[in-house]
Amino acid sequence: MQAYQRDFIRFAIDRGVLRFGEFTLKSGRTSPYFFNAGLFNTGSALAQLGRFYAAAVVESGIAFDVLFGPAYKGIPLASATAVALAEHHDRDLPWCFNRKEAKAHGEGGSLVGSPLAGNVLIIDDVITAGTAIREVMQIIKDQDATAAGVLIALNRQERGNGELSAIQEVERDFGIPVVSIVSLNQVLEFLADDPQLKQHLPAVEAYRAQFGI
């Protein structure tokens, strides 16, 4: 595990974004942990989050021309990542996002910010079912751009209804890498090393054994 990944897990726990207990997911599964990126909800938290995304961008080695944040959750994530790349990695890159509803007046259209052109890195919080990413892929295709990859905060490494996870399905269907700041592997490693949180390790390991990929 990289230092920034360990720092990100600690940061997510401290912010209440990553919690352990018993949670019912949309899928109906009872999960021993829950990740809610909406709780990165202050200026300093968003700035710090952008630095973690930027570190993961650099680590991934994915070549791209523009960052894209899908509405709505992806918008602040893409902007924070763009700021962090410029301030901390000397990479001043364009970014843009989409509106859920196209606008007929003003600048018009459904895209805001830089033109969506060339190789596009999509920034989002998680991929649950993959539906949102499929919509984004169509937006990129409509602009004659190319998806270079997807970066999310957490890969749950959890299969859907079939044998693959939603992330693996996206990788298979679109032939692009999906990378994350951390995956469940790193969360398990963090729990094993933390005396106060180690109590949650058996439940998370059991969940992984049942639903993991």
Swiss-Prot record:
The keyword Magnesium applies. Its cofactor is Mg(2+). One of its GO terms (cellular component) is cytoplasm. 5-phospho-alpha-D-ribose 1-diphosphate binds at residues 26, 72-73, 99-100, 103, 105, 124-132. Its EC number is 2.4.2.10. Orotate binds at F34, F35, T128, R156. Keywords: Glycosyltransferase, Magnesium, Pyrimidine biosynthesis, Transferase. Pathway: Pyrimidine metabolism; UMP biosynthesis via de novo pathway; UMP from orotate: step 1/2. GO terms for molecular function: magnesium ion binding; orotate phosphoribosyltransferase activity. InterPro entries: OPRT (IPR023031), Or_phspho_trans_dom (IPR004467), PRibTrfase_dom (IPR000836), PRTase-like (IPR029057). Signal peptide: none annotated. It catalyses: orotidine 5'-phosphate + diphosphate = orotate + 5-phospho-alpha-D-ribose 1-diphosphate. GO terms for biological process: 'de novo' pyrimidine nucleobase biosynthetic process; 'de novo' UMP biosynthetic process; pyrimidine ribonucleoside biosynthetic process. CDD domains: PRTases_typeI. Pfam families: Pribosyltran. NCBIfam families: pyrE. Belongs to the purine/pyrimidine phosphoribosyltransferase family. PyrE subfamily. Catalyzes the transfer of a ribosyl phosphate group from 5-phosphoribose 1-diphosphate to orotate, leading to the formation of orotidine monophosphate (OMP). Homodimer. This is Orotate phosphoribosyltransferase. It comes from Pseudomonas syringae pv. syringae (strain B728a). The gene is pyrE.
